[in-house]
Amino acid sequence: MKRCIVILVLVLLSVAMQAQKFPSWLAGKWEIPSVSMFSDSSFEDWIEVSKNHLESRTYRKFGDDTMYFDSMSMSIEKGNVVLKMYGEKDGKRFMADFIGKRLADEVWVFECAESDSPSAIYYQKLSDNEVYVWTEVRNDSYVCSDFIMYRR
C-alpha cells in the first residue's frame, strides 16, 4: 500500500512539474491591436494539440479576406521547449528552432543562435488575458518589436 501511495505521489509531482515546464497558458486566440488607424488588429491563434504541443498562426483580417503572416509550433523535444518558426539570416528566411527557457514563473525566452531576426522572442504573462511579447535582433538593419496580446 505504501508503495502505491509513493508511486502515485511521484506521478502527480511529475505531472505538476511538467505543467510548469511548458507555457500552456498561451493556448487560445490573442488579439494584437494595430497602432495605426489605417489597419485592423492582427491575431495569434495558439491551438493545444496535446498537453505539451501548441500550434499557432499569425494573421490579419481584411473584411472577408485573411492574410497569414507566420505559422509556429511549440513542443517539448529532447527535454527542451522548442518554438519552431521562420527566422532570417543574411536576408533569407528559414525554419528555425528557438530553444525556450523559463526566466521566471510567467516569463519565457526563445533564442536561436542561427537567426539574425528575430534572435530572441520573449513572452511574459501579465494576466490570464494579457501577454507582453518582445523581440531582439542581432543585426542593426532589422527592427525589434514589442506588443501586448489580449485574449479573445
Name each model feature, range by range:
Residues K2-L8:
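Sec-dependent signal peptide recognition
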Residues L10-Q18:
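Hydrophobic h-region of N-terminal signal peptides that target proteins for export
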Residues M17-K29:
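N-terminal helix-cap/turn-to-beta initiation motif at the start of protein domains
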Residues I32-E114:
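Central antiparallel beta-sheet cores of small beta-barrel/beta-sandwich binding domains
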Residues R93, D97-G100, D105, N129-R152:
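Edge beta-strand at a domain terminus
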Residues I121-E130:
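Extended Gly/Ser/Thr-rich low-complexity repeat segments
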